[in-house]
């Protein structure tokens, strides 16, 4: 902000700034306070009045420019953010297959328009060419008429014929210029049409490739999404639980088999024990029923025994003697 001085007297309100005082001059002018004597009849010749420069505030143009620039910068940033979000939203809705189809359709539409424009230009060129030929023919005809009139001695008629001939010749020259320009336009249109046709063919071939790639990418994405939704850890934990359960069932079956085998072996051991006890009881009876200790029961003789078992086993004999000793103790 700049301070602007405006001189006033003590009797009148402050004066407004004039058109001659520019803002740049007032902004660079320092603030000042001037005291000048004023001689009036109201105060008397000896009295002095003070004329004070009233201070006014003026807006600095530089601050205005800075504020305007900051506002524009903020607006541009906001506009950029909005455009970025809009582009992201539009990109999310874009389907490559539909976009490619629409692009090919638009290119075919442009090709149709270009062909129509080429046809119109060719028709216009044909008209110009016909007009040029007609003007050239008229120019030649009037030249022949001028020759004929001059041969007949009518110079005035020959002069008029030459004027007509010049008019048609000028028209033919102008038509020739337009025709040359038209040929350049036609050549350019034909070249661009052929180029667009080749581009469309290339775009169609590329469209098929891109569509195949897009479909493959979509399929791969769906497969990955399906794989991502599968809880692999849960499936593995379920397999581990089932494995533990199967192992527990196998252990239980082995235990039951072992228990059944132990019971069977126990039964056979009991049978063997009972047979041994029976043999021991029979042996006791035989020993207790004999008349003399150490005498064999009736029907048994040493000869028969020796005859039956010709070879004696020392271990068996020792066991037998031990049994005899125990029987005598009883």
Swiss-Prot record:
| Superkingdom assignment | Eukaryota
Q: What is its main location?
A: plastid
Q: Which Pfam families match?
A: PspA_IM30
Question: Where does it localize?
Answer: Plastid, Chloroplast inner membrane; Plastid, Chloroplast thylakoid membrane
Alphabetical list of InterPro entries matching this protein: PspA_VIPP1
What phenotype has been reported when the gene encoding this protein is knocked out?
Answer: Pale green and unable to grow photoautotrophically on soil. Decreased thylakoid content.
Q: Which GO terms describe its biological process?
A: thylakoid membrane organization; vesicle organization
Task: Kindly indicate whether the keyword RNA-binding belongs to this entry.
Answer: no
Keyword Chloroplast (UniProt): yes
Q: Gene Ontology cellular component?
A: chloroplast; chloroplast envelope; chloroplast inner membrane; chloroplast nucleoid; chloroplast stroma; chloroplast thylakoid; chloroplast thylakoid membrane; nucleus
Where is the segment annotated Disordered?
A: 287-312
| Coiled coil (residue ranges) | 124-259, 312-329
Which parts pass through the membrane?
A: none
Alphabetically ordered keywords of this record: Chloroplast, Coiled coil, Membrane, Plastid, Plastid inner membrane, Thylakoid, Transit peptide
**Topology in membrane:** Peripheral membrane protein
Which residues are the transit peptide here? 1-64
Family according to the record? Belongs to the PspA/Vipp/IM30 family.
Q: Assembly state and interactors?
A: Homomultimer. Complex formation involves interaction via the central alpha-helical domain (71-286).
Q: What does this protein do?
A: Required for plastid vesicle formation and thylakoid membrane biogenesis, but not for functional assembly of thylakoid protein complexes.
Instruction: Tell me what this protein is called.
Output: Membrane-associated protein VIPP1, chloroplastic
